[in-house]
Amino acid sequence: MIKVGIFGATGYTGVELMRLLSKHEKVKIEYISSQSYAGKSIADVYPSLTGFYDISLDDVEVEKAVSKCDVVFTALPAGYASKIAREAVKKGVKVIDLGADFRFDDYSTYKEWYGGEYDGYDGIKRAYGLPEIYRDSIKEADVVGNPGCYPTSVILGLVPLLKEKVIDGNIIIDSKSGISGAGHSPSQKNIYAECNESIRAYNVANHRHVPEMVQELSKASGEKVSVVFAPHLTPMTRGILSTMYCKLRENLNQEEIYEVFAEFYKNEYFVKVLKPGAYPSTKNVYGSNFCHIGFEVDKATGTLVVMTAIDNLVKGASGQAIQNMNIMFEIEEKAGLDIVPVYP
């Protein structure tokens, strides 16, 4: 059995890890932490887990977690995971960070967008945790930086096109996210009266996920990619629908675009390329680790419109983290994740 610890178990991504791992046959959770609920049973904090776990929350105790676990998930604010990772790696414990500490190729980008105290990247064998692109690197890594939710939806939709030089590098992205993407902590903007029957844009052209997108899309393209990103919060609990507007380099039809996607993802269980004319919906991936991809060619303007749908808490966070864990420990990649989406 793989012995697992979770730092930050009472945030949305932490409790989603526990939900998904409850059916993982090769995992046992040995340690969970919460600064807000230390000493309480996880089932008292989240009654949805009643009967699945008999474990109480600790305060953040790195030495204790490392002594009991083979791998730890960190779902903490920026800067914390790097400190935990250094101690864990010394003891041979693997780390999967659901925050931003290990997403970037260079520390300066992280510092510019996230700030805070940070131990840096030196001496840590790490990988960017998008399995469909970096599976081999993930397998060899001690620390994996789980991608952000928006970048996951965007990168999966665009990498095949950029690698095959189908589109140019000036891309406009419009993303709609469920309220859970704003996190567990309450704020006036996220209460029911503010969110219900309302969609609002936020951090347009200045969202912290932009440099992550640019980094990965530029690597796929082989040249610098320019991204204009407009995120929105919508009155639903889960899900991200990203719509990407790209200029075609040549006059390709629907069937040719489909073949580019189908060939790239032919061996990827969690990415489903929809047939031409079918568009993705967040409802059809709800509660699952799947990404659905659709597209449309606007012949009048030479624009390719790409659409992706994911569950922001699963493929956009905790499910993808478990997928990375499975790869790191060389077990079936679908373990704990082979779940039919919830419908309706």
From Swiss-Prot:
What's its catalytic activity? N-acetyl-L-glutamate 5-semialdehyde + phosphate + NADP(+) = N-acetyl-L-glutamyl 5-phosphate + NADPH + H(+)
List its EC numbers: 1.2.1.38
PANTHER family registered for this protein in UniProt: N-ACETYL-GAMMA-GLUTAMYL-PHOSPHATE REDUCTASE, CHLOROPLASTIC-RELATED (PTHR32338:SF10), N-ACETYL-GAMMA-GLUTAMYL-PHOSPHATE REDUCTASE, CHLOROPLASTIC-RELATED-RELATED (PTHR32338)
Q: Which SUPFAM superfamilies match?
A: Glyceraldehyde-3-phosphate dehydrogenase-like, C-terminal domain, NAD(P)-binding Rossmann-fold domains
Segments forming a coiled coil: none
What is the native source organism of this protein? Caldanaerobacter subterraneus subsp. tengcongensis (strain DSM 15242 / JCM 11007 / NBRC 100824 / MB4)
What pathway is it annotated to?
A: Amino-acid biosynthesis; L-arginine biosynthesis; N(2)-acetyl-L-ornithine from L-glutamate: step 3/4
Pfam families for the chain:
Semialdhyde_dh (PF01118), Semialdhyde_dhC_1 (PF22698)
Q: Which GO terms describe its biological process?
A: L-arginine biosynthetic process
Q: Which HAMAP family would you find in this protein's record?
A: ArgC_type1
Could you tell me where this protein is found in the cell? Cytoplasm
| MF (Gene Ontology) | N-acetyl-gamma-glutamyl-phosphate reductase activity; NAD binding; NADP+ binding
UniProt similarity note:
Belongs to the NAGSA dehydrogenase family. Type 1 subfamily.
The entry's active site is 149
What is this protein's function? Catalyzes the NADPH-dependent reduction of N-acetyl-5-glutamyl phosphate to yield N-acetyl-L-glutamate 5-semialdehyde.
Return the InterPro entries for the record: AGPR_AS (IPR023013), AGPR_type-1 (IPR000706), NAD(P)-bd_dom_sf (IPR036291), NAGSA_dehydrogenase (IPR050085), Semialdehyde_DH_NAD-bd (IPR000534)
Q: Under what name is this protein listed?
A: N-acetyl-gamma-glutamyl-phosphate reductase
Question: What are the leading ranks of the lineage?
Answer: Bacteria, Bacillati, Bacillota, Clostridia, Thermoanaerobacterales
Gene Ontology, cellular component aspect: cytoplasm
Tell me which UniProt keywords the record has, alphabetically. Amino-acid biosynthesis, Arginine biosynthesis, Cytoplasm, NADP, Oxidoreductase
